[in-house]
Amino acid sequence: MIKPDPDSCHLLLDSRFANEEVQKNPYTYNNIREVLSDGALNAATVEHPVTVYIAPGIYWLENPQSEAVIVREDPKDLYPYGCKVNCANLKLVGLSENPEDVVIAANRGNDHGAKGNYTLFHFFGEQLEMENLTLGNYCCVDLDYALDPAQSVKKRTEAITQAQLADTNADKFHAKNCRFVSRLNLYPVCGAGRSLYEHCHFEQTDDALNGNAVYLDCEFDFYSGMPIYQASGTGAVFLNCTFHCKYPQDGETHAQYFTKVGGQITLIDSSFAGLPDTKVAVLWTKYPSVALKCYQANVTYPEGRFTPPEVADSHTVDIDEKMLAEAYYIRKDGETIYNVYNLLGGKDDWDPLGNGEVIRFAGKTDIPTQLLLESEAFELEAGGSSINIKGKCLTFDGRERKCEIHFKIEGDSADSIEIQRVSEGSCLLQLKDSNIDHETEVVLTAQTKEGLQTGAYVRIHPRKVAAPRLTGNPVICLEGKMLRLSYDFTEAENDCSDIIWYRSRNIRVEDKIVTAISQPDQPEKVYALT
């Protein structure tokens, strides 16, 4: 690639420059810290970026051989950062079409060169872009530099520890043709209001990826089962991505979750791959909530070796034939246009792919991608008041849009609840029978005609009445290796007693430990001694 003429808004970083050469031109640098200093970047404004062009080479934030321990510069910092960058609008552009040629690196992690989860960068500003470069933390992984093998560096430790890349408070972040390399807690520039990763490569283990972002034409190397800690907000969207599951060929079926603690995931036109004899079960999360719905369309798996989500769980919504699909893609005349403009355009019409005009002309903007209820659990009491259930539809960038929500009840006691429509986005739930004498639970499902779905539990409680009178004191009798509690009521009653058994070393029960509890409407009258 041709090197640009440097000026205050176009800086050049080249590690091969001699100090004398750098001193002759105020806009050329040979040190990554200096080119990202406040003084070097002060020409940037929100409307006009400073672009840093980076020649092929490895740019270390710290000496990779140093044994110094990095700590938090400020107690308020989330992590010990290698470098804090202040720039209203910053572009980092590698001067090679191969992102492996331009490497910004460190090799520190938690308890290995740092106290805490070492993170290369924190970027302050409104907008951040990266292109044609690798951002890597080589604490737990070797840096193999093909352009000059003599510059390759072995990992600092064999331990897989938290070794992070970067975060930002920017509103907009766009990475194109970049590589993000680490293992545990990859953290590939997280925190922006809107994030797009385009044609990027990721290597990581757990708790690693940005959980609120759009990934387009990206490749992922999964070395463990939970690459996202939580898909926060409106979640993560993967468009035309490939997931390489790097599990051993050991005959075991490996669980490939997307998240550790849940959140919405959307897969469009994506595929999974693994070694020839690797078996993988793909799931969204280990313990999905009743509200969780993840969406997919045209996702392919190696036949016979991968178990897809629609078989493995009930939280998957296929949107291939639904109107909701237009929130993510438009298919016309054999061509697919990914609707990133709908997902990330926001109030300021951000258009990182440059196809916003086509999307607007087609009328496929402001399409919601998430349906939420006020809670994941509601309570109804026999003889009590009705409850008002409200839902809302959100665009991917979090703006609420009007939509018509349809509600239905599912479960063994569904017929005992009446649904009254209040408005296009809410309903009233009322028990038909006020004489219900046991606790039960049903599922409330909410959905839109476009294809959005969510759910919640509705717990039904019997009417509270005064406790019945006992004919005498309760008695516990030993029957072999069983203790039996006996009691009678003065009048015939449906026994809903809540019996709890404790174990204690003394009669004062100061150190009591719960050993058995009753289930709803099933008093635990017998306790087995062990």
Model-derived features with residue positions:
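Proline-enriched interdomain boundary motifs that mark the N-terminal boundary
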Residues: 367-376, 465-474
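Short, solvent-exposed loop/linker segments at the N-terminal edge
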Residues: 377-385, 475-481
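Solvent-exposed loop segments of extracellular immunoglobulin-like
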Residues: 401-405, 491-500
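Surface-exposed, flexible coil segments in extracellular/virion-facing regions
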Residues: 413-429, 502-519
